[in-house]
């Protein structure tokens, strides 16, 4: 698996993250989300139960052959060793690794042999994006998010979009956006320069639990931009 097909797809990439139940995962798939995310960082509010993780993984694999566009499972990690990430990725059948800490993504990608989504904080981490060789974009997807992630903190979208435009709008620098996204504002986010996809967790929850209506509406509103 690589990001080539995702980057060349007609519509935006939509990821629903922080999934902790088979019901929510099925809803995300039924809504046509492209990426399903599970938190593999120990001790977090949205950390997935190992049994549920494997059930979601089996569901994604089963749907991959029956849906018009392939769906992939993303495991989110933060400052965990390469060995731990590889073990969990193998146990859960993860397709894409998302690194949400200070990990050197190229080192991890080479060790894991999996595509990587790398969380970047704006403007601190822009140099990481600028220094990424264009030939690596099939293995690397940048994601602008807050430092902690999953907090609902709204990023300064306009500054990020303006920065991308200042670079000349290069396709190799296109990125996913997270932070404060909701069914109500996702369409606006996808109008910004450089945004190739969106990543949501808290924005599709009610009282800390995944809300099926919000998942459906979020994906539907995002896909309207295709």
Curated annotation (Swiss-Prot):
Pfam families: PRAI
Functional pathway: Amino-acid biosynthesis; L-tryptophan biosynthesis; L-tryptophan from chorismate: step 3/5
EC number(s) stated in the UniProt entry for this protein: 5.3.1.24
Enzyme class label: isomerase
InterPro entries documented for this protein: Aldolase_TIM, PRAI_dom, RibuloseP-bd_barrel, TrpF_fam
Presence of the UniProt keyword Acyltransferase in the record: no
Keyword Protein biosynthesis: no
A GO term, aspect molecular function: phosphoribosylanthranilate isomerase activity
The reaction(s) this protein catalyses: N-(5-phospho-beta-D-ribosyl)anthranilate = 1-(2-carboxyphenylamino)-1-deoxy-D-ribulose 5-phosphate
One BP annotation, GO: L-tryptophan biosynthetic process
Keyword line: Amino-acid biosynthesis, Aromatic amino acid biosynthesis, Isomerase, Tryptophan biosynthesis
Similarity comment: family membership: Belongs to the TrpF family.
PANTHER family: N-(5'-PHOSPHORIBOSYL)ANTHRANILATE ISOMERASE (PTHR42894:SF1)
HAMAP family on file: PRAI (MF_00135)
This protein's name: N-(5'-phosphoribosyl)anthranilate isomerase
